[in-house]
Amino acid sequence: METATIIVIFVSSLLLGITTYSVYTAFGPASKNLRDPFEEHED
């Protein structure tokens, strides 16, 4: 494979991994421990 193809595959895999981890953190089992500052304050 050419170097450019390998770089594109690496960057794409990295972005997909970061996105997957972010979605898992936001909506997965650990999300119950996250606090929402907007729900803590009454208007």
From Swiss-Prot:
Keywords: Chloroplast, Membrane, Plastid, Thylakoid, Transmembrane, Transmembrane helix. Coiled coil: none annotated. It is found in: Plastid, Chloroplast thylakoid membrane. The lineage of its organism: Eukaryota, Sar, Stramenopiles, Ochrophyta, Bacillariophyta. May play a role in photosystem I and II biogenesis. InterPro entries: PSII_PsbN. It comes from the Eukaryota. GO terms for biological process: photosynthesis. Signal peptide: none annotated. The chain crosses the membrane at residues 7-29. This is Protein PsbN. It holds the Pfam family PsbN. Its main location: plastid. HAMAP family: PSII_PsbN (MF_00293). GO terms for cellular component: chloroplast thylakoid membrane. It is a single-pass membrane protein. Belongs to the PsbN family.
